[in-house]
A protein has these predicted regions:
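PRPP-associated nucleotide enzymes
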Residues: 1-196
């Protein structure tokens, strides 16, 4: 598995491009819904870039760890505000399997949203749902700025289960662009947390 570790600045630039695509398409969402948890940060930025919309959330649980997903996502929190009759932009950070996007989209449609369009920063070619708007197609495992420590925690767990040295995982993350000092810091913090 190849990791890609985009910076905050790269993500912001990608969101600027996405906002331009949405504006050029003449789609004006009245509500932007971020899928918990990865969709929250980009949904908030998109609210700022597009303006004139309300921000809401929906919670879908899918991944247990890195590349370790349940078969089907579960809606754990319905949309937080009424969407009936509204144009809705549903946002997530990545369309990987596409199942969580599909589940959330179906949920919003069942709540009688007028139009539901989907947007993600990254799109993977095997996703069962191609977002209406996305910025980059990739096959890599994306490590977003808002989930780096969580990713390292999962990597440590996976390395232990598979008998792989943690050093190997560290090198793969560094090769993907994560700062080595940050990797070491998080590993040390996690190991201290485990010791109590």
């Amino acid at each position: 598995m190849t990791f890609e570790v985009p910076t905050w600045d790269k993500i912001y630039g990608m969101l600027l491009n996405l906002a331009e695509k949405i504006t050029d398409d003449k789609f004006k969402p009245e509500i932007i819904v971020g899928i918990s948890r990865g969709g929250w940060p980009p949904a908030r930025v998109m609210l700022d870039l597009l303006g004139n919309a309300k921000l809401a959330n929906v919670s879908v649980e899918f991944y247990k760890g890195i590349a370790d997903a349940t078969d089907e996502p579960i809606l754990t929190q319905p949309v937080s505000i009424p969407v009936e009759g509204c144009n809705v932009l549903l946002f997530d950070d990545v369309a990987d399997t596409g199942k969580s996007l599909r589940l959330a989209k179906n949920h919003l449609e069942s709540k009688r949203a007028r139009t539901v369009k989907t947007a993600t920063i990254y799109y993977k070619p095997w996703s069962i749902l191609k977002p209406d708007y996305y910025e980059e197609k990739t096959r890599n495992w994306i490590v977003f700025p808002w989930e780096r420590k969580e990713t390292i925690r999962c990597l440590i767990e996976n390395c232990r289960k598979e008998g792989i040295p943690i050093e190997k995982a560290k090198n793969r993350l560094a090769d993907g662009g994560m700062d080595k000092h940050l990797i070491d810091r998080f590993i040390n913090e996690i190991l201290k947390e485990e010791q109590g």
